[in-house]
Amino acid sequence: MNNPIEGHAGGRLRVLVLGSTGSIGTQALEVIAANPDRFEVVGLAAGGAQLDTLLRQRAATGVTNIAIADDRAAQLAGDIPYHGTDAVTRLVEETEADVVLNALVGALGLRPTLAALHTGARLALANKESLVAGGSLVLAAAQPGQIVPVDSEHSALAQCLRGGTPDEVAKLVLTASGGPFRGWNAGDLERVTPEQAGVHPTWSMGTMNTLNSASLVNKGLELIEANLLFGIPYDRIEVVVHPQSIVHSMVTFIDGSTIAQASPPDMKLPISLALGWPQRVGGAARACAFTTASTWEFEPLDIDVFPAVELARHAGQIGGCMTAIYDAANEEAAEAFLQGRIGFPAIVATIADVLQRADQWAPQWGEGPATVDDVLDAQRWARERALCAVATASSGKVSDMVLERS
């Protein structure tokens, strides 16, 4: 992975933080504040739901170059130069930055991702959905090495891949904690509540990422992301369960050796590495204490109980807009679950239903989406189809779930 960014004349890297009020964004600002000799904030962007947090960030950083997607929140904040549905994209286009951290949630991050790549800035990508949805569009817009992953698994893979040449790679191994329901059977999952799905055993994340981790949809998205970022075919990417979340991923080489990246679960490490790539940031996180007795476990993923990863693999192998459809169907189904309209297993069942009906979005002559509108049209169709599936799944299930939770 090459490094197209050398920094501007002042020596510090200018960082534009998209999704600054979320879990990744707030931790990134802490990393930047702790390393004023390495980084400076040149802009902030947020949806507007956590306005108090954004106002505190504005005061702490002194940054006035801010975008808020919600017009009402922007009006309440006052003196916001960019607001409205296209505010974040305009902020990216008009801000001189060395690094754009995209920590937005969901496929709405696609246009800002493309805008960041077009500016030539390094893209520190936490918004995996934009890569999953945009696929070949995003890759075509990127210079070699311009996209640096923030996800701990892909950050780990990028580090491990330094240990060999591309033709020496046998397979990638993505690790998964297994989520809060590891070891449960399919029947147990029927009674899972949003509160239970909102607690992760090892990571502290935002609501949607935590839910996606519980359903293993997040690992499905990461499988697609690994294929796109590193160009390794799907049949050479494995997913294994590692409950301790210390080994973040591994690369096995053709000579039988495996290189792993290990560290206690702390997102500040991959965040800092993405901001400073290829240089590391000293003291970003604590290291493993190897003199203290510990056990690291690895086990196969139960794909019968948690089929989300294999659905993602299937969508990725088909190509076209199928990965965008996987992502959009999940967003609708996950929201329906959080609202108590469907049961937990219906999230992945909805994705499967939508993919099964999506033949029209399969690739024509091996082609991917040609434009952003192609992606958005596919996702619009997927959301509509998902809502139909949710309505069907809701029959007889919502009342049972409400009774269980009352």
Swiss-Prot record:
Keywords: Isoprene biosynthesis, Manganese, Metal-binding, NADP, Oxidoreductase
UniProt-annotated binding residues for NADPH: T21, G22, S23, I24, G47, Q50, N127, E129, G206
PANTHER family: 1-DEOXY-D-XYLULOSE 5-PHOSPHATE REDUCTOISOMERASE, 1-DEOXY-D-XYLULOSE 5-PHOSPHATE REDUCTOISOMERASE, CHLOROPLASTIC
Taxonomy, superkingdom: Bacteria
Organism for this UniProt entry: Mycobacterium leprae (strain TN)
Presence of keyword NADP: yes
Family: Belongs to the DXR family.
Name of the coding gene: dxr
Function: Catalyzes the NADPH-dependent rearrangement and reduction of 1-deoxy-D-xylulose-5-phosphate (DXP) to 2-C-methyl-D-erythritol 4-phosphate (MEP).
Enzyme Commission identifier(s): 1.1.1.267
One GO term (biological process): isopentenyl diphosphate biosynthetic process, methylerythritol 4-phosphate pathway involved in terpenoid biosynthetic process
Cofactor section: Mg(2+); Mn(2+)
Designated name of the protein: 1-deoxy-D-xylulose 5-phosphate reductoisomerase
Pathway: Isoprenoid biosynthesis; isopentenyl diphosphate biosynthesis via DXP pathway; isopentenyl diphosphate from 1-deoxy-D-xylulose 5-phosphate: step 1/6
Residues holding 1-deoxy-D-xylulose 5-phosphate: K128, S152, E153, S177, H200, S213, N218, K219, E222
GO MF terms held by the record: 1-deoxy-D-xylulose-5-phosphate reductoisomerase activity; manganese ion binding; NADPH binding
Record: residues binding Mn(2+): D151, E153, E222
Pfam families noted in UniProt: DXP_redisom_C (PF08436), DXP_reductoisom (PF02670), DXPR_C (PF13288)
Catalytic activity field: 2-C-methyl-D-erythritol 4-phosphate + NADP(+) = 1-deoxy-D-xylulose 5-phosphate + NADPH + H(+)
